[in-house]
């Protein structure tokens, strides 16, 4: 069985070298991390990633739906708060610290008594690491898991390393096994659809000449929160947006304790077609050092 220690994961799993994190403030009050050709724009409201670009090419959906835009962070399981998202984590202003990293810290959630901190760091390989901390501000021992949600356009192909029978509900999204991975070509339907999967610690999306890979800790099937999963893909109805979702281990936190969880983002051009191929698989493994 794979072992997981929340407070040690960041050092044990992510093998990237930090670069100088250049942070600029835009005219409209957003914060932009520049790392060579790669830029990431973060809003202090909700600590949301609103843009992730290679040059002028954008990978995050720029369509704004209520409570469903940009890249955000929630606590899991969702059944503890249902809907809409917890305002202190998803839309209220975060406290900002700038230095060799960009750090944003939320208010304490009135409903859940957690506080979230997000730390953004540029790396020498042009990737950007987002480290999340959940702190238990209650006087009770609690269990919680970290959860990152990123909206992208309904285009291209989504893929990861998991057998088809590890994707549930079976057949809800048309994943196909090819080149040792599971692939889903974006389509549309008249209803919302969502799948869970037990992957291998990474999730990739390719569309419009860009390849994005997100790398995180690889979980055993027993480690996610109840009714949740390491990898989730949500496809909103019609041709609107898709959510790329990843979760960390369901972890017990004593009062005042915290967990840390890290996702490293990679973005690069891809000249081939956005469809299953050995070339796309090789590009992912090279880019994210898998």
Question: What role is predicted for each listed range?
Answer:
Residues 267-290:
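Terminal connector regions
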Residues 1-4:
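Positively charged n-region of N-terminal signal peptides that target proteins for export
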Residues 30-91:
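Acidic-aromatic substrate-binding/catalytic surfaces of carbohydrate-active enzymes
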Residues 21-25, 34, 76-125, 139-144, ...:
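Extended, loop-rich substrate-binding clefts of extracytoplasmic carbohydrate-active enzymes
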Residues 37, 106, 256-270:
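Short, hydrophobic/aromatic-enriched beta-strand segments in well-ordered soluble domains
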Residues 31, 38-40, 50-52, 58, ...:
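A contiguous, surface-exposed recognition patch within enzymatic or periplasmic domains that forms
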Residues 7-15:
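Bacterial N-terminal signal peptides
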Residues 13, 20-29:
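Short, Gly/Pro- and small/polar-rich lid/capping loops
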């Amino acid at each position: 069985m794979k072992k997981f220690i929340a407070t040690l994961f960041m050092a044990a799993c992510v093998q990237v070298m930090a670069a100088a994190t250049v942070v600029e403030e835009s005219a409209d009050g957003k914060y932009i991390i520049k790392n060579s050709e790669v830029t990431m724009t973060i809003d202090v409201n909700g600590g949301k990633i609103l843009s992730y670009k290679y040059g002028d090419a954008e990978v995050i959906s720029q369509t704004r739906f209520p409570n469903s835009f940009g890249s955000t962070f929630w606590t899991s399981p969702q059944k503890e708060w249902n809907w809409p998202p917890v305002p202190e984590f998803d839309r209220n202003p975060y406290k900002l610290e700038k230095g060799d990293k960009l750090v944003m810290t939320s208010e304490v959630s009135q409903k859940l008594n957690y506080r979230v901190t997000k730390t953004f760091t540029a790396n020498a390989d042009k990737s950007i690491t987002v480290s999340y901390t959940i702190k238990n501000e209650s006087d009770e021992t609690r269990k919680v898991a970290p959860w990152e949600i990123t909206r992208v356009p309904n285009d291209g192909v989504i893929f990861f390393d998991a057998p088809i029978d590890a994707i549930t509900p079976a057949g809800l999204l048309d994943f196909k096994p090819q080149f040792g991975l599971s692939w889903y070509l974006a389509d549309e339907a008249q209803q919302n659809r969502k799948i869970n999967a037990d992957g291998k610690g990474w999730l990739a999306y390719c569309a419009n000449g860009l390849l994005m890979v997100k790398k995180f800790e690889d979980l055993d099937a027993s480690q996610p929160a109840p009714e949740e999963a390491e990898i989730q893909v949500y496809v909103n109805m019609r041709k609107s947006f898709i959510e790329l979702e990843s979760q960390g281990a369901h972890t017990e936190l004593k009062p005042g304790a915290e967990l840390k969880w890290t996702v490293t983002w990679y973005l690069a051009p891809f000249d081939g077609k956005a469809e299953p191929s050995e070339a796309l698989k090789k590009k992912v493994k090279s880019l994210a050092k898998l």
